[in-house]
Regions:
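Short beta-strand scaffold positions
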Residues: 66-67, 140, 160-161
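Phosphate-handling substructures
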Residues: 81-141, 204
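Glycine-rich phosphate-binding loop signature in dinucleotide/nucleotide-binding domains
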Residues: 57-60, 149-156
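Domain-level recognition of soluble alpha/beta enzyme cores
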Residues: 176-202
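Active-site-proximal alpha-helix that buttresses catalytic centers in soluble enzyme cores
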Residues: 3, 14, 23-89
Length: 207
């Protein structure tokens, strides 16, 4: 498929799949992880192994990229071992930085940071949690990373990343409220989401 973007004439035939990492103990405890570097739990490792089997049978993955964070990198490593592919760390795929809110549940955040949460909740795309980053700042690093991947590769690609990354991207591409992202695009551990490249470039070049 040819896209009228910088470097037009470039054919992009690959499929790009985004996958959320496997389960962690903080997922089970409903604690906000963000940039905090939490490892997979045993169930998370089993989920990664199960996904690897699915990918090996039904997908033509030729390259694997991953966030640098342990929960993503370990998921990628397990899958890569099954597929015979060495994962590459790609900057920009990291989870959103929730700053001082990390380690807490959302209920605790509302109790401990009532004013900050109120302001953030009403304008999630642009408001920044204490010592964290906004969803727009996440987009500012994510979109160029995905663009670079699609310009570099000509074969099917797997990118291991995080829930807020996927939900933020889907909200941006579909032009839906960022406040509704969890309702609209909730992503389970090791869930596969295929990136619509036409939609990506329609939005990316326009903005």
């Amino acid at each position: 498929m040819s896209l009228d973007v910088p470097g037009k004439g470039m054919d992009i035939n690959l499929r790009l799949y985004l996958v959320r990492h496997g389960e962690t103990d903080w997922n089970v405890e409903s604690r906000i992880q963000g940039k905090t570097d939490i490892e997979l739990n045993e169930k998370g490792r089993q989920q990664a192994e199960g996904l690897a089997d699915v990918l090996k049978k039904g997908y033509g993955i030729r390259r694997i990229y991953t966030s640098r964070q342990k929960r993503a990198a370990e998921t990628a490593e397990i899958i890569g071992q099954r597929l015979g592919i060495r994962p590459e760390v790609r900057e920009g795929l990291e989870e959103i930085n929730f700053g001082k809110w990390e380690g807490h549940t959302w209920r605790q955040v509302r109790e401990l940071f009532p004013q900050e949460y109120f302001v953030w909740h009403g304008n999630r795309r642009y408001e920044v949690p204490p010592e964290g980053e906004s969803y727009q700042q996440l987009l500012d690093r994510l979109l160029p990373a995905l663009d670079n991947i699609m310009r570099r590769d000509r074969q099917d690609v797997l990118s291991i990343t995080h829930s807020a990354v996927i939900m933020t991207l889907m909200s941006y591409l579909n032009d839906t409220p960022f406040e509704d992202m969890a309702r609209n695009y909730k992503t389970g551990n090791t869930q596969i989401v295929e990136l619509d490249q036409d939609l990506f470039y329609q939005r990316y070049k326009r903005n």
